[in-house]
Amino acid sequence: MIQLVYNKQKGIFMDLEFIFNHVISGYLPIMVLLILYFIILKSFGNRPSKGHIILTFIFSFYLVGVLSATGVCLKANFSPRFSLLPFIDMIRGPKDAVLNVILFLPLGIFLPLLYEQYNSLSKVFLLGFLFSLSIEIIQMFGFGTTDINDLITNTFGAVLGYGVYELLRRLFSDSLLEKFQTKGKYSLYEPVILWTITILIMLTIQLYIYDILFASKMSGEIQKW
């Protein structure tokens, strides 16, 4: 579930800034690791296209954003909350369902666009499901509510994103899209490794970077509220 706290008096989502600050805190170490990763690939004679490299940096920024928006950027406090009844909350609160679909829609576009191995609806479905499941498991540790409806809507968002990708394939030539794509067996594992490393960074290093860069500023803003 996307973590948003609304201030009725000011009529704004203050924590959009809060989320963005966590995105920046998490993206800085990810960016350094990606630079090292592509340097190592080049040293071994494996040179991805410039389009793939640039889009991978954008994709990693998106992944950090997903984790920040779902609360996987805060200090752990084990207090599990569960919502295991499917579809009921979707009917009661369709806004959350729509936001969850939108949140994972880019994933269904990025995966086949970046990795040849994910030019498959079944693989996008599986990875969308696993990515969402990992978030729901982590949310057991005080980062939000573990909700089966989030799992359903996130996975549907990834599948819908794959449909958008197929539409793009019809609009643009394959040669243009292939400029962003990497091939080979390792392309099957790269997004999984990137997602895992991003989670680990968001739960560890990111917290310290956030405290250094933004904690004092945000605590002052909270006191004003």
Q: Where do the language-model regions lie?
A:
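Bulky hydrophobic segments
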Residues: Y6-I137, F141-G142, E166-W225
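Non-cytosolic membrane-interface motifs at loop->transmembrane helix junctions
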Residues: P86, T145-F156
